[in-house]
Swiss-Prot record:
Pathway: Protein modification; lipoprotein biosynthesis (diacylglyceryl transfer). This is Phosphatidylglycerol--prolipoprotein diacylglyceryl transferase. A 1,2-diacyl-sn-glycero-3-phospho-(1'-sn-glycerol) binds at residue 140. Its main location: membrane. The lineage of its organism: Bacteria, Pseudomonadati, Pseudomonadota, Gammaproteobacteria, Thiotrichales. It is a multi-pass membrane protein. One of its GO terms (molecular function) is phosphatidylglycerol-prolipoprotein diacylglyceryl transferase activity. It is an enzyme of class 2 (transferase).
Amino acid sequence: MLQYPHINPVALQLGPIKIHWYGLMYLLGIFAGWYLTRYRAKVKPWAPIKPEQVGDLTFYVALGVILGGRIGYIIFYNLPYYFHNPSQMFFLWDGGMSFHGGFIGVLIAFALFARKIGANFFDLGEFVAPVIPIGLGAGRIGNFINGELWGKVTDSPLGMVFPTGGPLPRYPSQLFEFFFEGVVLFSVLWLVTIKKRPRYLVLGLFMFLYGCARFICEFFRQPDPQYGYIFFNWMTMGQILSIPMILLGAVILIAVFIKIRKNKCKNI
C-alpha cells in the first residue's frame, strides 16, 4: 500500500489570506499554457495568432476555464446542494471544478476571441490543443493535494488511505488521470506537432484521446455520491459527459483521413 503524503492544502498564509495549492496548480497550468502558446506563435508560420496576442487569449481562456469549470460542476454534479447553499458557489479553493464545463467555457472563449481578432475558430483550437493537457495535469495534482476525487476501494499495492476517504485504501485515481490526461496526452500531441501533419489532426486527437482516457480512468474513480452509477449500473456522469468528446473527436479524425485519401488535406 502506498502512503498518502498529507500535504497541507494551504500553501501559504499571509494573515487572514490563505493561498491554496489547488489554486496555485491552476495558475501554474495557465502560466505554462501561456508560455508554450507564445513560443508556438513565434515558431509556427501557420499560427492563427501573433505572439503579442497570446496574453489576451490566455485571459479569455482562464475566464472560460474558471467560470465554465465552476458552473459546469454546479450544474452537472451538485445542483441541489448549491441551490440550497448559494454562497458556496464562490468557494473555489475548496475544489469543485468540472473539466467538461471548463471545456465548454474554453470553446466560448475561443469563439469570442477568434471573432475579435478575425481568426478561424477551428484553427485556434488546433493551435492551442497541444498545451491543454498541462492544465489538466496540474488540476489533477491539485485534486490529489486536496485529498478529493479519490478512487474506489482496492486491495491493490497502488491503494492509499485518503484523509476523507474512510479507513480503507483506495486507488489514487487523481494520479492516474494526471498521468494519462496530462503526461501521456501532452507527450502524444506535442510529438505529433513537431512535424507537418494534416490540419485538425491534433484537435481531433485531443478530443478523442482525452475522452477515452477520462472514460477509462472513471472505472477506478469513486462515483459522485449524489449520482452514483447512472446507466447500466456502471456508467458515471464523467463517462456520460466524455462520450460526446469521443464521438466528436472521432468525426474530426475520420474527416481528416477522408481528406488525406482524396489528397485534399492541407498540411501545417
